[in-house]
């Protein structure tokens, strides 16, 4: 397909993460464990790639995103791409196409999403994808079948000629899917947009061991050497999985949710954030998740709500994903009516971190602590946060808190 004009495709990946709900406590054991490992490993590589690009672009702003959400949207898009466009998308997701077949890649995503979407009364995790198609466009039936089978995606027809109405329809869908936490995801639509692909994740978690709101108090958070802000600081003394990692020059705190997810908070020593970002690998994450030990500690963690909105074209290009944005894109597997290119890709993520845990009416939990003086671990400087699925060890969300008040 050759043309000097390519019509626009809009890619939207939206995430809402209310930290302290998630996956089933015991995901069923299947023959997919090896497949899960491959998916988790590739997602981790992709996650760190995304994080480092954003960190390099600015070291003074918060970062929060879902590599799973972005990867799912790109994998869906690859179903309708061909030749070099397809290869770039899948290789950008760190798949070796000589070792893993395209069919296995999509089966891997299908299984992972099925695992994550398991119902759990204690936890809330919902992922989903939808296509918004111009009402004059005919989509390839095979593409529709495959995105439905592998990604449970629905297709909705809208009139992109009426950009305000189309924008309203998409934003209303995302707002409803994320329980009102992501609003106005689409600020504007390119005049040539004929297709929008939306992927979203809604996450609400409850700590296994919640903080007491009565103990939350105002404290200083040091954004940098010259900037200090006041934040509500959550406080708890008890048994924590916390240790000091010499390799990373950082304190590492693991906090479990009810269900099958863990948050990893990594607090570097003053002036060591760059060292942490250059040194941290997926192997560190696996080690933290596999070697669990608790000790008595005083932990102080800021209560916060941050968000990030990203132009994925700027983020994905350094990772080698470029052709899909160009007039040379081959997305003829989606439609043969008009030549398509990805005109805009937007990802929005929202993180809320608070004291909430189990609503245990009239129940008090007392923990025995050793007589030795416990370490005081205070997250009063910028830190990294990674939220993982314990079953697959997939990094579902990654971020950096530079300023909790922004």
From Swiss-Prot:
It is found in: Secreted. Residues 362-381 are annotated as: RCL. The keyword Ubl conjugation does not apply. The modification Phosphoserine is found at residues 33, 372. GO terms for molecular function: serine-type endopeptidase inhibitor activity. The record marks 371-372 as: Reactive bond. GO terms for cellular component: extracellular space. CDD domains: serpinA1_A1AT. It holds the Pfam family Serpin. InterPro entries: Serpin_dom (IPR023796), Serpin_fam (IPR000215), Serpin_sf (IPR036186), Serpin_sf_1 (IPR042178), Serpin_sf_2 (IPR042185). One of its GO terms (biological process) is response to cytokine. Gene3D superfamilies: Alpha-1-antitrypsin, domain 1, Antithrombin, subunit I, domain 2, Serpins superfamily. Residues 1-24 form the signal peptide. Keywords: Glycoprotein, Phosphoprotein, Protease inhibitor, Secreted, Serine protease inhibitor, Signal. Inhibitor of serine proteases. Can inhibit elastase, trypsin, chymotrypsin and plasmin. The reactive center loop (RCL) extends out from the body of the protein and directs binding to the target protease. The protease cleaves the serpin at the reactive site within the RCL, establishing a covalent linkage between the serpin reactive site and the active site of the protease. The resulting inactive serpin-protease complex is highly stable. Belongs to the serpin family. Interacts with CELA2A. Interacts with ERGIC3 and LMAN1/ERGIC53. Interacts with PRSS1/Trypsin. PANTHER family: ALPHA-1-ANTITRYPSIN (PTHR11461:SF165), SERINE PROTEASE INHIBITOR, SERPIN (PTHR11461). This is Alpha-1-antitrypsin.
């Amino acid at each position: 397909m050759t043309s000097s004009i390519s019509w626009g495709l809009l890619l939207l990946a939206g995430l809402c993460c209310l930290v302290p709900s998630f996956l089933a406590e015991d995901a069923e054991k299947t023959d997919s464990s090896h497949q899960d490992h491959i998916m988790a490993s590739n997602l981790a590589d992709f996650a760190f790639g995304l994080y480092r690009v954003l960190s390099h672009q600015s070291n003074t702003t918060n970062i929060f995103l879902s590599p799973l959400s972005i990867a799912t949207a790109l994998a869906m898009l690859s179903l309708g791409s061909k030749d070099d466009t397809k290869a770039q998308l899948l290789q950008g997701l760190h798949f070796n196409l000589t070792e893993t077949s395209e069919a296995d890649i999509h089966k891997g995503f299908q299984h992972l999403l099925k695992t994550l979407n398991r119902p759990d009364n204690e936890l809330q995790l919902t992922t989903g994808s939808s296509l918004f198609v111009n009402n004059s466009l005919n989509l390839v039936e095979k593409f529709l079948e495959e995105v439905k089978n592998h990604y449970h995606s629905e297709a909705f027809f809208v009139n992109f000629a009426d950009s305000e109405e189309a924008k309203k329809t998409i934003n209303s869908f995302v707002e409803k899917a994320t329980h009102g936490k992501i609003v106005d995801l689409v600020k504007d639509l390119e005049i040539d947009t004929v297709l929008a692909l939306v992927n979203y994740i809604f996450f609400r978690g409850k700590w296994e061991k919640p903080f007491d709101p009565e103990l939350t108090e105002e404290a200083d958070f040091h954004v940098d050497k010259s900037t200090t802000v006041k934040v509500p600081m959550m406080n708890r003394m008890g048994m924590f999985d916390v240790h000091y990692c010499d390799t990373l020059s950082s304190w590492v705190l693991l906090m479990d949710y009810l269900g099958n997810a863990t948050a990893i908070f990594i607090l570097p020593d003053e002036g060591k954030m760059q060292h942490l970002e250059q040194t941290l690998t997926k192997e560190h994450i696996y080690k933290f998740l596999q070697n669990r030990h608790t000790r008595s500690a005083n932990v102080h963690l800021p209560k916060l709500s941050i968000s990030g909105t990203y132009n994925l074209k700027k983020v994905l290009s350094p990772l080698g994903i470029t052709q899909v944005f160009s007039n040379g894109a081959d997305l003829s597997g989606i439609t043969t009516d008009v030549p398509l290119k990805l005109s805009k890709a937007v990802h929005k993520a929202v993180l809320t971190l608070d004291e909430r845990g189990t609503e245990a009416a009239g129940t008090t939990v007392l923990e025995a602590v050793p007589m030795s003086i416990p370490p005081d671990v205070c997250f009063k400087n910028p830190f990294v946060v990674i939220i993982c699925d314990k079953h697959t060890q997939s990094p579902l969300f990654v971020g950096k808190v530079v300023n909790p008040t922004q």
